[in-house]
Amino acid sequence: MSLQKGNGDVKALLQKVLNAEVSSDVAEPQSIDHGLLIFLGVAETDTEQIAQCMIHKIIHLRIFDGGGSKFDRSLLDIDGEALVISQFTLFADTSRGRRPSFRKAARPEKAEAIFRYFCDQLEAAGPQAVRRGTFGSRMIVKACNFGPFSVPLEIP
């Protein structure tokens, strides 16, 4: 599968975790064990096809240790879990002034649709468990980072 699909700017920040949890005032807490905490940003130009490319990249990215070699196993290889948090602030532009601009981030309606699609398709792709934060709400995210190891991803 080619990762050059469309003209979107979807961004993700992946963090390897031993466990992670998200809670909010509007939903039950969600938690995972060993796997990835995924902060997902959606641009106005993003599509379901671009989200699918990001999913493919995430589940096959070899960032987990195995056997005697570093970085030779993927999320699928380790039967890992994923916690996905919507994060429009990944599109912060701080190049001017003292207040960030988020003009490249998708409108909430579009971002929520792509976020839901991403989570549903990620779940179908096979990680052990996929949990999600509540879109559009203030959340408390707790993570026990492993490494620490964080990887920014962009699908152009």
Regions found by a protein language model. Give the residues of each.
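N-terminal, polar/charged subdomain of small-to-medium soluble alpha/beta proteins
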Residues: S2-G97, S101, E112-P156
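An anionic oxygen-ligand recognition environment, strongly enriched in 2H phosphoesterase
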Residues: K104
